[in-house]
């Protein structure tokens, strides 16, 4: 695994050829990491719980991905459920949602893979084969 990357002036790591954000205890993240390793993909590993994404990173990824913002939420997570976000999110602005996501990496759907021109949220092998 190569640990090279370029950090932009504002601290956002978007110049990484590929950054892999995951929670090591998550079985989906483990499966995704095995896929990356088996396919000899170089990436920078980032523990999403210890080093959660910033508002600026999330905003950039959201815009680059073309996905609805709700796709960035870990809707099956305990924190999402305990905060009753299913009912609260529809009334929140995008800015409020992005700020909330940035408060705790466990709110973010994982894994997240970012590259120079793509963002993938969740592990779908067919999509990863196409984009990575």
Describe each model-derived feature in a short phrase.
Residues 16-34, 44-46:
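Local sequence-structure signature of Cys/Sec-based thiol-disulfide redox active-site neighborhoods
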Residues 42-52:
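A short beta-strand-loop structural module common to alpha/beta enzyme folds
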Residues 50-132:
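Thiol/selenol-based redox catalytic cores and closely related redox-interacting motifs
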């Amino acid at each position: 695994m190569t640990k090279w990357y370029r950090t932009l002036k504002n601290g956002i790591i978007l110049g990484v050829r590929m950054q892999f954000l995951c929670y090591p205890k998550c079985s989906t993240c483990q499966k995704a990491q095995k896929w990356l390793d088996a396919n000899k993909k170089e990436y920078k590993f980032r523990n999403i719980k210890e080093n959660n994404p910033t508002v600026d990173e999330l905003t950039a990824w959201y815009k680059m991905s073309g996905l609805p913002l709700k796709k960035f939420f870990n809707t099956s997570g305990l924190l999402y459920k305990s905060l009753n976000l299913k009912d609260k999110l529809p009334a929140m602005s995008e800015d409020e949602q992005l700020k909330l996501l940035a408060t705790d990496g466990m709110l973010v759907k994982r894994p997240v893979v970012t590259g120079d021109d793509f963002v993938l949220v969740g592990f779908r092998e067919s999509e990863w084969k196409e984009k990575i």
